[in-house]
Amino acid sequence: MITLITAVPGSGKTLYAIGLIEAALSEGRPVFTNISGLVKDKFSNPHLLSDAPDDWRDTPEGSLVVYDEAQQAHLYPSNAQRGPVTDERLTAMETHRHTGHDLVFITQAPTFVHHHIRKLVGLHIHLYRSRGLQAASKYEWSHVCDSPNDRKEQQRADFVLWKFPKEHFAFYTSAVMHTHKFKMPKKIGVLLVFVVLGLGAVGFNLYKNSGLASMAEATASVAEATPSPLALNGVKPSSLAAPYQWSAAAPAVPVSGCVANRSTNRCQCFDASGVVLAIEHAACLSVISSPLPRQLLSTSK
């Protein structure tokens, strides 16, 4: 199969190819590649890993050949020449399956490589890495997609979020892959600020309401524990709501007049009907000695 891998620098193209190379070496297949900075000792069967020649036909049958920066002039760059293709390396790709070869071309954009290769591609993989994440959106087509960043084309593709396999970082050196740091989008940052403020407001209200409830409970407890003055005097608080107050004491009667006999040391007071009233001796004398009329309440005998 002919596979095309496209993405801008730092998106994980080489890292993805490392996975293909390691899988092929694990199966015992010979692999040829021009990827620079490979640490061969990290791979399985490193003796099967060799540098790729400019002509893929110079590799044994059943080989996996991976060309990085395939648009380079000595490899398979795009050109505007019309008419029959004269490069035998390109025309031989039409029957590459007869020799069991798998060819992988890595570049930034599909239009960078020769149009004859684009016509023969059976798998196009496009990677898009956003804001320095340790992952990339992977889009796959069974043919070349000339506009892999077009939303409509991406909807037609098979999509998966591909997490960078950290175990493969040690297989090669990349000055771009490991220097990208995650940058949070401004919209997400503003949204997080509002979420934090909202959660803080909710928490404060809950704390405030719980504090008021605790104060109310404490006040109610103190009120229940402290007897009212009326209760101390033997009067129930519920009696305050009654429309009338009843008392066992005798009704008070106005004093109309008093008479004193000094020889017998007696003093009596009467109401308007002449009934003798029960009144203290001193109070009776006080009524006589003070000018009348005045009202003095007493109880009848």
From Swiss-Prot:
Disulfide linkage: none
Membrane topology (UniProt): Single-pass membrane protein
Transmembrane segment boundaries: 187-207
Sites where the protein binds ATP: A7, V8, P9, G10, S11, G12, K13, T14
InterPro entries: P-loop_NTPase, Zot_N
Primary location class: host cell
Subcellular localization: Host membrane
A single GO cellular-component term on record: host cell membrane
Keywords linked to the UniProt accession: ATP-binding, Host membrane, Membrane, Nucleotide-binding, Transmembrane, Transmembrane helix
Annotated GO MF terms: ATP binding
Leader sequence residues: none
Protein's job: May play a role in phage assembly.
Comment field (misc): The strain Nijmegen sequence is shown.
Designated name of the protein: Putative assembly protein ORF301
Species whose genome carries this gene: Pseudomonas phage Pf3
